[in-house]
Amino acid sequence: MVGSRAYGLETEESDVDRRGVFVAPTRSFWRLAKPPTHVEGPLPEQFSWEVERFCGLALEANPTILECLWSPVVEHTTPAGEELLSIRHAFLSGRAHRTFVGYADAQFRRLNPERPRWKQAMHMIRLLLSGLHLARHGEPLVRVDAHRDRLLAVRRGELSWDEVTRWRSELVTSFDDPGALPAEPDRRRVEEYLINTREAAL
């Protein structure tokens, strides 16, 4: 599970955002029509990636994918899912230093200072907090309990635009180097996992 309930930022109106990973039968790749790389549903706000697509995005340090691997709310896992979680550090690399800041910057540029979308502003700050924790400690910060009150104040529009941009600038400035992250992900370990998973799905 991801979203506000995983971050510790849920309110009474919050949806339940589910994200998952599935393994397509190996024989389905032998056909001309390949299996989907992702599917939506069957529940509302549910989205799942085929395992190879998921691993590819994780190796690229996609923030959403990396936070899925560290989500504290897990509803169901299979043996393949347990193994995926056990190798989650293999996906980490210094490129996350760029992707987290880049994603947050893209959100910031879409905000209108005259009429800010405060929920989006909150998640922009939350993403920077998560990425900074990842750079310093080697794993993203998913639950933001220590920052909950201030983040929710942003969402309610109780902080001024200047205060939000100042908080953003302080966080961006702190991204001076990748810190605890390795230069490259452990692609060999990820490929071994994929091969074993495909063999098990024959």
Where do the protein language model's features map onto the residues?
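Short hydrophobic/aromatic segments of transmembrane alpha-helices and their interfaces
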Residues: 1-2, 48
